[in-house]
A protein has these predicted regions:
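Conserved GHKL (Bergerat-fold) ATPase module
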Residues: 1-360
């Protein structure tokens, strides 16, 4: 808190007239400029800057959102968690210094926690390239990052949106491979889209997935799963229609063409197997869970998973039981034979006496 004393302001009982004074506008601009200069000086001392950001970091981000005139200066002072920053935050300048050769974008992702966001399947391709990703764990972080647009010459994009596609970084050979996969799985993607209906906007072959079978990504102007949850909670608190507000927020489903599960689905579709529809829905629901979305039909999801697990168990159990029974029978036979042999040996070794003859 502070106070500004000025002899240039006219004395007036009307606060409305005073607020329109040009002198007040000049004072306001100078205060902002002097404050920014002070913040920049604090940023030169690492320990002081940590203390400053822990106390006022959120307000710096609010300034990034609301103060367009000073947005660039404030953005250089804002700190965000990242996949490479450990427990400390990072500034955009520090991020830029760590960017990999050939990296053309600055990436960020939102999540309920840093660990949850960092484990999202949409980051697999970026991790493989060694790219650092900023992590927004608070609504203020996400709103601030959404409004950045560009930092210097780099576009700032949400890694969980289609705008983060790395098509501009692919070689000619990689582009050709992508087109071949798209044609090869054309029938499969069309089938999955029909099976899911309005739950997804599009079903596409992914270049960003390396180990997961599927993932959900938002279109360029879509809301992240965390922002959707936040908006639903706000609508519910205000007594509004949360489902109406979130209508039309379907995501795109991306499939990994090299994953065994997707290859199995392709085979099921090609053979016209009835299991293909349930398999498609499971891939979608797995993508929803791993990408941070809520499964709209938890009971159905559980039922499909149990059905899949149960089908495998029924085939495996008789075989295992039969093997166990066979092993038990073999052990019993071996024990009986051993006991008989031992009894025979004992009988043979026993001397022949009148008593033995009487027993016989």
């Amino acid at each position: 808190q502070g106070m500004v004393d000025s002899e240039d302001l006219p004395l007036n009982v009307s606060r409305e007239l005073l607020q329109k004074s040009k002198v007040l506008s000049i004072i306001s601009k100078r205060l902002v400029r002097k404050s920014l200069d002070m913040f920049k000086e604090i940023a030169k001392d690492e320990e002081k800057f940590k203390t400053f950001t822990s106390n006022f970091g959120r307000y710096i981000k609010v300034g990034v959102i609301e103060d367009q005139d000073n947005k660039e200066a404030l953005l250089k002072l804002a700190t965000f968690a990242s996949t490479d920053s450990g427990d400390e935050g990072t500034t955009f300048d520090a991020y830029k210094e760590r960017m990999k050769e050939g990296q053309k974008k600055i990436y960020y992702i939102s999540g309920a926690s840093k660990a949850a966001a960092a484990s999202s399947p949409v980051l697999e391709g970026l991790k493989k390239k060694g790219y650092e990703v900023l992590v927004a764990v608070d609504q203020i972080d996400e709103i601030a990052l959404q409004g950045v647009g560009t930092f210097e010459e780099f576009a700032v994009v949400d890694a969980a949106k289609e705008s983060a596609d790395d098509a501009d970084e692919l070689s000619e050979e990689e582009k050709a491979t992508k087109e071949d996969a798209k044609k090869e799985f054309e029938k499969t993607t069309a089938f999955v889209k029909e099976a899911l209906g309005n739950q997804v906007d599009r079903v596409e072959i992914s270049t960003r997935l390396t180990s997961s079978p599927s993932a959900l990504v938002q279109p360029q102007w879509g809301m992240s799963p965390q922002m959707q949850k936040f908006m639903k909670a706000q609508a519910a608190a205000a007594g509004g229609d949360e489902m109406g507000m979130m209508g039309g927020m379907s995501a795109n489903l991306e499939l990994n063409p090299t994953h065994p599960a997707v290859l199995k689905l392709k085979g099921l579709v090609a053979s016209g197997d009835d299991e293909a529809k349930d398999f498609s829905i499971i891939l979608y629901e797995v993508a929803a869970v791993s990408s941070g979305y809520e499964v709209t039909d938890p009971a159905g999801f559980a039922s499909r998973i149990v059905k899949l697990m149960g089908g495998e168990a029924v085939k495996a159990k008789p075989t295992a039981a039969k093997a166990d029974d066979k092993a038990d029978d073999k052990a019993d036979d071996k024990a009986d034979d051993k006991a008989d042999d031992k009894a025979d040996d004992k009988a043979d070794d026993k001397p022949i006496t009148p008593e033995v003859m009487e027993e016989n």
